[in-house]
Curated annotation (Swiss-Prot):
Catalytic activity line of the entry: uridine(38/39/40) in tRNA = pseudouridine(38/39/40) in tRNA
GO biological process terms, semicolon-separated: tRNA pseudouridine synthesis
PANTHER family to which the protein is assigned, alphabetical: PSEUDOURIDYLATE SYNTHASE, TRNA PSEUDOURIDINE SYNTHASE-LIKE 1
The protein's name in its UniProt record: tRNA pseudouridine synthase A
Role played: Formation of pseudouridine at positions 38, 39 and 40 in the anticodon stem and loop of transfer RNAs.
Residues that bind substrate: 111
Gene label: truA
Keywords attached to this entry: Isomerase, tRNA processing
InterPro entries documented for this protein: PsdUridine_synth_cat_dom_sf (IPR020103), PsdUridine_synth_TruA (IPR001406), PsdUridine_synth_TruA_a/b_dom (IPR020097), PsdUridine_synth_TruA_C (IPR020095), TruA/RsuA/RluB/E/F_N (IPR020094)
A GO term for molecular function: tRNA pseudouridine(38-40) synthase activity
Catalytic EC class: isomerase
Length: 245
């Protein structure tokens, strides 16, 4: 068997997320069906992260096995040909060792969350960034973010449906960068809880609106209660950027 590692970009707007689900179209299903059409083999695609419906990806990584050798550039061309009705593109492919696993071999995952912060919405960024009309205090958000860095119990920021065995995660990066009309939040960790990034963003926005003081984020973290945190930020502002191995 030959194991292939692919890197994928997709627009999540009209997709039901990464994972295959009955009755809806997912990224996993689109790619598995595309692979079958050119290889004749039923494969299971393993992704490095299970993005929710509406979440986008710039560098999602996945792997699959085929019984025959195919040149990586031909795999890219073939997948993109059969996946072309959808906003899903493979932009890199390589043969890897058979012990490589897109999910379990990962050492770090990186996300970006985009906020358009101006009085009027952006047509160009519709369903690609969260529009917030009121000015956000980025300095206060940065101060609050510092409380979340490092190893913590992130129960307050996990979805009620989260299936992770432990709420303990290590946030290695949480940078907030302000442009003229856009705020980007950069988050990195070896792994994340379900909705963790979006719940962190939603809470930091409350700080940015001066509804919460920056120090309140520490209280939210220590509460270990989802009800203590802010709203879940919209899925469409989130981008899965990169996985490191």
């Amino acid at each position: 068997m030959y194991r292939y590692k692919i890197t994928i970009e997709y627009l999540g707007t009209n997709l039901a997320g990464w994972q295959r689900q009955a009755g809806v179209m997912s990224v996993q299903q689109i790619l598995e069906e595309a692979i079958y059409k050119f290889s004749g083999e039923q494969v299971i695609l393993f992704g490095s992260g299970r993005t929710d419906a509406g979440v986008h990806a710039i560098g999602q990584v996945a792997h699959f096995d085929l019984s025959k050798y195919l040149e990586p550039h031909k795999i890219i061309t073939a997948i993109n040909y059969f996946a072309r009705p959808y906003a899903v593109v493979v932009w890199h492919c390589a043969i890897v060792l058979n012990d490589f696993h897109a999910r379990f071999s990962a050492t770090s995952r990186h996300y970006i969350y985009r906020i358009i912060n101006r009085p009027y919405p952006s047509v160009i960024d519709l369903n690609r960034a969260w529009w917030i009309s009121s000015p956000l205090d980025v300095l206060a958000m940065q101060k609050a973010a510092a409380y979340l860095l490092g190893k913590h119990d992130f129960t307050s920021f996990r979805a009620s449906s989260c299936q992770s065995k432990s709420p303990i995660k290590t946030l290695t990066e949480l940078n907030i960068v302000k442009g003229d009309e856009e705020i980007k939040l950069y988050l990195s960790a070896p792994s994340f809880l379900h909705h963790m990034v979006r719940n962190i963003v939603g809470s930091l926005v409350l700080v940015g609106k001066n509804i919460w003081q920056a120090e309140h984020i520490k209280d939210v973290l220590e509460a270990k209660d989802r009800k203590a945190a802010g709203l879940t930020a919209p899925a469409y502002g989130l981008y899965f950027v990169k996985t490191e191995y």
